[in-house]
Amino acid sequence: MYKIAKENLSALFQSIAENQELYLPVEVSGQVNYKAWTPDAKVSLETLKTVKSPKDAFFPQSENLYTVQRDGKKLSIQPEALKEQNFVVFGMKACDIQGVKVLDNVFLSDPVDSFYAARREHGTIVAMACHEPEESCFCKVFGIDCAEPAADVATWMVDGELYWKAPTDKGEALTKAVESLLTEADGTDAEKLETEKTAIRAIVEKLPYSDLSLEGWNGDALTEKFNSPVWEELYKPCLACGTCTFVCPTCQCYDIKDYDTGHGVKRYRCWDSCMYSDFTMMAHGNNRTSQLQRFRQRFMHKLVYYPANNNGMYSCVGCGRCVEKCPASLNIVKVIKAFEKQGGDK
């Protein structure tokens, strides 16, 4: 294990950015999101949760797929180049890292998404443990330990020092690249770190949503959950704004669109939301026609369909962003609690 003083982190960021792109939490206009590092960036590692998840690094909100060029009567198709430059995402929390694993199951399964696969190949994740989990957090419900994030490099901020462990080959390579800025940790440091982990877990145990029950949400009771009358009242406050889907670290739905460049056409994909009335709109009109159906689909996918098809892995990581951002205060916690209270299938 290594360590580096907090006041030396700027030098660490500079060293990393000399050879590859570096993305980390940066405050802009009062909001913190993952941005490319620059020497004058207002880095905010102490922020527990960015407004949006850092999934943009691997699954951008918008990306070009290919261009069709027109030259008289001739057309040529030019595929967009795949990601080739290495990059580091620094400061990811355990919940967001689990979110990437959910995306992996989708985009790295056959047929493999080459754009996503290239970014995963060239990306290195540096995790940071959650020093003070917030009341909206419920990652523990999904078996996530925010005190022990699993990534290429795991870090903890303790008493003004960043502790650094690198369990993967990518992590080892990054460690060697910045080794001159790191110092070896000793036994006292190891004790401090274990004390920090214990303190973090103690906070998690006291969070208001830490005891949510997922009983019956693993796909075994699909029909009962789907047909439950609970949905008929639960969905009504939903505004169909899609905020929950855009801040969520596991949502992977996208649309594909074309736009005229004046010299041809660019085809690109962009995030979409299952909460929108035109989501999956097709000529034969089989998209879900009511807000109730769309609302039910979102949470059935998170809690039933996805785990049923992915060895019990849920498509929610308990980050709490939907809890904080929904303007109608309607979120996955309320859904789970509603079924706990009313039995769901009664």
Residue ranges and their predicted role:
Residues V100, P249-C253, P327:
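Active-site-flanking alpha-helical
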Residues S213-K236, Y254-K346:
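Ferredoxin-type iron-sulfur electron-transfer modules in oxidoreductases and energy-metabolism complexes
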Residues Y235-T245:
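Extended amphipathic alpha-helical segments enriched in small hydrophobics
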Residues M1-A221:
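Iron-sulfur-associated redox domains of electron-transfer enzymes in respiratory
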Residues T243-Y259:
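A donor-sugar binding/catalytic signature common to diverse glycosyltransferases
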